[in-house]
């Protein structure tokens, strides 16, 4: 039965956390409505408080009806419902991705306010299949092709207990219990590649890859035997003699849904058993992240890891140091990896960061470029600045705001600054790093640079911590 499968999944995913409350994202579609009813039964059995969250993206007339419907269901189940609104600001460029990020920002911020650690979402088996196909078309590596049932966003655990349940079973459950749901009309549009894949697979047809590029990456042919063998399970290479039926099907660009699911499971197993442990070891051994918002990568230790893991480490550092939520594309990271192999010092920019080789180490620090971080007024006790630093004030400080240090301000207070600790830690790159740190100003005057313990008055007291909103399916930075 459906509930038994759901219960087994969620108990395995959550483990023995001893949670007293949990949240759930519900849109009004069949997937999330089914999840709501299943989660409600489970929450009642385990005496857990369930909070229902809906996000209106303000893009469709029907969305207001959907939110109202979910509110009514929540009330009937005696569950608290929260309706959030995404402001697209009439900017429709890259809207799907921005709406997704905005939705997760809203939901996880609410979870933090409510002191909730876990958010359930209704990603089901068909979603995983579609994602695999889309990533295959983008020529993703093994990390990109893998999927995870537990993710992190804004330090909230995102759990997907429907991962092995097809949409058809969820719809059947709703029909059997006479439960209404809404269909998003945009799901039937051929405008989005995901919809084309979905419609084809729903009819039982094979998935045909959308492009004809060869998908085996030249740069991985010289990798270790272990990672090459692992890679050929995902990418075809007939010369190895290990190509599976799926690999041969992929070679002619054709895969059945069952074959995709099988391949996804193989990929996930490889990631979980081999590549993920290697990635965690690589970060522990080769990476040092400092409270000043920069990092060093030990290139001697870095060299022993597989190429796929090397790409992930570089992206891990770029995301954390830049404060961005998305990883750089492989084709952007590849030139950096090639430069590293040349064993010469260099200085490059990528993904909002400066990447500088100093002998056997790689220094990565923030680059503002033409787009400076937004100044933040310290109205509340604390504020997040540049998506990286949390600044907390320990006293009432009127009209102060957080910003970056300009060259003009630096010249004024330069002689009063003790930069020796930062100079030593950053291999004499202290001036560049200093300009990326948060400072507190009142009007035009710098009153504090907490990182280097600079205060123009003994009455000021601010705390600062490096707290990037890091999102990864493989590692968690907290």
UniProtKB/Swiss-Prot annotation:
Its EC number is 6.3.4.19. It is found in: Cytoplasm. Pfam families: ATP_bind_3. ATP binds at residues 27-32. The keyword Ion transport does not apply. One of its GO terms (biological process) is tRNA modification. It comes from the Bacteria. InterPro entries: Rossmann-like_a/b/a_fold, RPE1, TilS/TtcA_N, tRNA_Ile_lys_synt, tRNA_Ile_lys_synt_N. It catalyses: cytidine(34) in tRNA(Ile2) + L-lysine + ATP = lysidine(34) in tRNA(Ile2) + AMP + diphosphate + H(+). GO terms for molecular function: ATP binding; tRNA(Ile)-lysidine synthase activity. Transmembrane segments: none annotated. The keyword Hydrolase does not apply. Signal peptide: none annotated. One of its GO terms (cellular component) is cytoplasm. Keywords: ATP-binding, Cytoplasm, Ligase, Nucleotide-binding, tRNA processing. Its main location: cytoplasm. HAMAP family: tRNA_Ile_lys_synt. Belongs to the tRNA(Ile)-lysidine synthase family. Ligates lysine onto the cytidine present at position 34 of the AUA codon-specific tRNA(Ile) that contains the anticodon CAU, in an ATP-dependent manner. Cytidine is converted to lysidine, thus changing the amino acid specificity of the tRNA from methionine to isoleucine. The N-terminal region contains the highly conserved SGGXDS motif, predicted to be a P-loop motif involved in ATP binding. This is tRNA(Ile)-lysidine synthase. It comes from Rickettsia conorii (strain ATCC VR-613 / Malish 7). The lineage of its organism: Bacteria, Pseudomonadati, Pseudomonadota, Alphaproteobacteria, Rickettsiales.
């Amino acid at each position: 039965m459906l509930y038994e499968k759901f219960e087994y999944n969620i108990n395995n995913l959550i483990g023995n956390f001893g949670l007293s409350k949990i949240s759930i994202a519900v849109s009004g579609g069949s997937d999330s409505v089914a999840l709501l009813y299943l989660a409600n039964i489970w929450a009642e059995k385990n005496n857990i408080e369930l909070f229902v969250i809906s996000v209106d993206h303000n893009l469709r007339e029907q969305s207001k009806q959907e939110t109202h419907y979910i509110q009514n269901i929540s009330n009937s189940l005696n569950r608290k419902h929260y309706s959030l609104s995404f402001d697209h600001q009439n900017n429709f460029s890259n809207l799907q991705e921005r709406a997704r990020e905005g939705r997760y920002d809203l939901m996880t911020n609410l979870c933090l306010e409510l002191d909730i650690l876990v958010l359930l979402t209704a990603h089901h088996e068909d979603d995983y299949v579609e994602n695999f196909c889309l990533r295959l078309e983008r020529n993703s590596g093994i990390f990109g092709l893998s999927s995870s049932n537990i993710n992190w966003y804004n330090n909230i655990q995102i759990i997907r207990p429907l991962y092995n349940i097809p949409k058809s079973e969820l719809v059947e459950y709703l029909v059997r219990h006479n439960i209404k749901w809404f269909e998003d009309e945009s799901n039937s549009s051929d405008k989005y590649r995901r919809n084309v894949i979905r419609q084809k697979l729903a009819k039982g047809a094979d998935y045909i890859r959308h492009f004809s590029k060869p998908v085996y990456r030249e740069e991985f042919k010289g990798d270790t035997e272990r990672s090459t063998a692992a890679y050929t399970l995902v990418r075809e290479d007939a010369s190895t003699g290990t190509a599976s039926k799926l690999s041969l099907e992929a070679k002619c660009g054709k895969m059945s849904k069952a074959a995709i699911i099988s391949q996804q499971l193989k990929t996930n197993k490889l990631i979980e058993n081999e590549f993920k442990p290697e990635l965690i070891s690589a970060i522990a051994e080769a990476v040092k992240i400092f409270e000043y918002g920069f990092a060093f990568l030990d290139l001697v230790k870095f060299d022993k890891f597989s190429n796929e893991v090397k790409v992930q480490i570089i992206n891990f550092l770029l995301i954390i140091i830049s404060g961005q939520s998305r990883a750089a594309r492989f084709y952007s990271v590849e030139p950096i990896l090639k430069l590293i192999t040349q064993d010469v010092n260099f200085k490059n920019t990528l993904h909002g960061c400066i990447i500088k080789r100093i002998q056997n180490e790689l220094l990565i620090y923030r680059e503002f470029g033409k787009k400076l971080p937004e100044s933040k007024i310290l109205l509340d006790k604390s504020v997040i600045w540049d998506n990286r630093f949390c600044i907390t004030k320990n006293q009432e400080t009127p009209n102060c705001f957080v910003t970056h240090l300009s060259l003009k301000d630096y010249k004024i207070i330069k002689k009063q600054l003790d930069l020796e600790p930062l100079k030593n830690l950053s291999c004499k790159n202290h001036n560049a790093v200093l300009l990326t740190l948060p400072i507190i100003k009142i009007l035009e005057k710098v009153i504090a640079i907490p990182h280097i313990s600079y205060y123009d008055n003994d009455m000021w007291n601010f705390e600062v911590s490096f707290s990037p909103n890091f999102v990864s399916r493989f590692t968690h930075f907290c």
